[in-house]
Amino acid sequence: MSLATLIIIFLALGGWSSVSAQIEQKWKPHDRNRPAPAAVDPGAPGTETTPGRPPQDAIVLFDGKDLSKWAHKDGSAAKWKNADNYFEVVPKTGDIFTRQPFGDMQLHVEFAEPVPPRGEDQDRGNSGVIIMGLYEVQVLDSYHSKTYPDGQAGAVYGQYPPLVNASRPPGQWQTYDIIFHAPRFDDGGKLLRPAHVTVLHNGVLVQDNVEIHGPTATSDPYKPHAAKLPLELQDHNHPVRFRNIWIRELADGD
């Protein structure tokens, strides 16, 4: 049988997609011996007066009581204001970082912009959720306030504007639900796969599994880094409030 004939037969059978499907199909459809997923209490959504309840398997980063799971870059205790079920940026005290590092994750953050609103453009309720201390999802008062599109609320800062502006008025609690897959590097530091992020702002999809081009604070290319790094919240000199922050670590998809 000639090589050309073999290729024709191979393509007729679906080519690589057929082979790939056979390799990946470890379990038969409806196989009752297939391991069942663990049951997890999904928690409950919040209201304007009450924070939501995290899922049972979440790592709670702020439970409404203290900031013990956060620190400044030098390791000192977080100096942001801790109030009744929320905490607030204290301008000029510096960004805060989780004491625990994270990689692939499902992240939930609730925030509220200052009231009354002050300033315009980037000087209006500015903060940021900086994943791994490198990849920022912008926090900003974008309700009836204009700025450059890749710098408004829900943007991957400096790279992707949000698909829509889903902002609520200042003072109302808002949510980010973020699915993040960290970049992968080989042992020599070569980039194997860039980071990807999906963001829902107040339940509305604003970033759809976009490929992050590198650190968002600069236009620099990727540099190799650890598989897990702390989550960072930004002090941009505005008293933005946060509550009900939790993470579910995701299994390595490689």
Language-model features and meaning:
Residues 18-254:
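Carbohydrate-interacting regions of secretory-pathway proteins
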Residues 4-15:
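Bacterial N-terminal signal peptides
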